[in-house]
């Protein structure tokens, strides 16, 4: 396609006469009445993308005399500055030479320039409000093949400048598909200093309606206004899927390219079609990875979550979203963004698709036979190459020129680093490896070994992925069981709490009653514990006296109120010293007294221990059942069962054995 002529002509836009010429595919204007220049167009000629243009305009241009034009005819929009400020801006960014036809134009001579003659052409039907085409998509069962059909379009040698056709800012910033050198009908990128023909672009012939114009104003100057209010409550006549520029983009394409999450959600709420395509069959998700806005704002994860069902779409050149990502790596400053987009999509795919389906999409070839790995290797984007290889990307798939990713990787090893740096600005050159650091470039022998080892590495990765998925499923099942048990426990706690709340509500004195009952139980426990100690002491005294009576005249007496004591026996006061007439030696008597005292201390210690055992044992229904059984066997009431009877029963049972 022939490039546009740089000859200056006169045109009228929005009722304003301008001198116009086309430089690098950009319409550059100079107003006739005051010679003011469009600073936005100058920055486009200097190859600034939209975020960069916005920053330069805010920080350098709009601080001085300027006029901001919004609405009206698309090409006339932008920030206009006095002639000398425009010349200074062009000189600063080294485009004054290429812009000399418009900058050096003598106004007196310019008056003799005739308006550009419009070509007589049959009017095309209006495409405003049309829906974009649905994208070609790849299901998991059809990822083995590649759509190699090339677009069949006629190339027009000239472009008419019409008042009724919109050429909006930003349309030329699109990153095109990989050029097909063998195809004369391939669409060329604006980076090739050409523009798309009218027949291919299908420029809008009807003026934008109020909704579309409001949306375009927001997209072109988002820093200057809020989101259009009608999006929060879309009116019935608002067509959310209508085309709003001459590349066939809808509002959703623009919002996704900008990474504006709130705008995307509002458009989706208004029933925007996530699968709508522009004239190259590019979906909004594809457009979102062409620019770095989603990387700068770290919003791509949210965009991907909203548009994930279109990941498998391909455009008219058979390119998947992976192709579009790695295409941008021809610009070194976009490699980090491309790596970010790749990782996000690969992680999402591996979570929703079998591994083999992910591999098929990664190895998909476009209409030129290029895989995403081949393009990344050709551009020298080693970070992207490593990411793709980790998902079994095949470096041995040839394109139509019989070139493979392996060859580009080997060439990258052989190419000197200085040569790589000199090629850093190459666009789609097969020898462009910009951005590779010396540490990445390994010796040729190691590269050969690496390429040969790739199939083995891929197999190991597949086995590892299968084992990981198996273990992950087991852990997920364990987690489900644990969560179910946790939920049951929480439900039981909730029911218990509800019952407790109900009891407290129906019985206001419930808490006080419980405290009283607990206190009474503790007092009863203390009393029973003391009585048990007294009972044990009495039992031991009784047994001791009975065992000593046949052998000695020693008599042990204890106070008559002994059983009424609360603390049981003491060691020194409760017993009277025994009268022993058989002991004549006072020393022996004292020894016996000391021994007896020691035995009493030991006895009391053992008694306390026995009481503790009784307290821990308690009396349950089984013990009571035994008491009733023994009482019935002896023909007495359970209440009359005494220690003497129990001892007699025990002695009788022992003799029988």
Swiss-Prot record:
* Keywords, comma-separated and alphabetical: ANK repeat, Cell cycle, DNA-binding, Meiosis, Repeat
Residue span, HTH APSES-type domain: 8-115
Which Pfam family, giving just one, matches this sequence? Answer: Ank
Q: Name one GO biological process term.
A: negative regulation of transcription by RNA polymerase II
Against PROSITE patterns, the record matches this protein to: ANK_REP_REGION, ANK_REPEAT, HTH_APSES
**Compositional bias segments (type: Polar residues):** 148-165
Where's the DNA-binding part?
39-60
Q: Where does each ANK repeat begin and end?
A: 247-276, 368-397
> Where does the record place Low complexity bias?
136-145, 176-191
Positions with biased composition (Basic residues): 114-134
Q: Does the keyword DNA-binding apply?
A: yes
Q: What induces it?
A: During conjugation and nitrogen starvation.
- UniProt region (Disordered), positions on chain: 113-192
The answer to keyword Transmembrane applying to this record is: no
* GO cellular component terms given for this protein: chromatin; cytoplasm; cytosol; MBF transcription complex; nucleus
At the top level of its lineage, which domain of life is listed?
Answer: Eukaryota
Q: Name one GO molecular function term.
A: DNA-binding transcription activator activity, RNA polymerase II-specific
Oligomer status and interactors: Interacts with cdc10 and cdk9.
As for what it does, the entry says: Required for the initiation of mitotic and premeiotic DNA synthesis. Has an additional role in meiotic division.
Could you tell me what this protein is called? Cell division cycle-related protein res2/pct1
Q: Which organism is it from?
A: Schizosaccharomyces pombe (strain 972 / ATCC 24843)
- What's the source species' lineage? Eukaryota, Fungi, Dikarya, Ascomycota, Taphrinomycotina
Q: Which gene encodes it?
A: res2
